[in-house]
Amino acid sequence: IEENRQRRKREEMVRTLQTRPEPNTAEWELIRMVTEAHRHTNAQGSSWKQKRKFLSDDIGQGPVVPTSEGDKVDLEAFSEFTKIMTPAITRVVDFAKKLPMFSELPCEDQIILLKGCCMEIMSLRAAVR
């Protein structure tokens, strides 16, 4: 039974791959635009890797201050974190602005979309480094 199930899965996969249509001209153009927007707004190179060095050894070594909720914050680590995150978030916003029709959305909808996807985009970008 398991062998039949595996065979049917393979056959279905082959059928799906054979019947999948090629993207049309408009879809290829959209793919090109998104790819170009990504390339223009994605940070590359060793400078990003240099900035993140504080993560492994330095956390907990700087001055620690309590927050109003009673949590403790390492000011130096937080400062380094914001130095990295602020430009990363700015690049995600710039990426979104380069996407077709994004700027046509109402401002409130743009903000909702950016809040919902910002961390995912930054995670994907970090994963491919």
UniProtKB/Swiss-Prot annotation:
InterPro entries: NHR-like_dom_sf, Nucl_hrmn_rcpt_lig-bd, Nuclear_hormone_rcpt_NR1, Nuclear_hrmn_rcpt, ThyrH_rcpt. It is found in: Nucleus. GO terms for cellular component: RNA polymerase II transcription regulator complex. Gene3D superfamilies: Retinoid X Receptor (1.10.565.10). Keywords: DNA-binding, Metal-binding, Nucleus, Receptor, Transcription, Transcription regulation, Zinc, Zinc-finger. Composed of three domains: a modulating N-terminal domain, a DNA-binding domain and a C-terminal ligand-binding domain. This is Thyroid hormone receptor alpha. It comes from Sparus aurata (Gilthead sea bream).
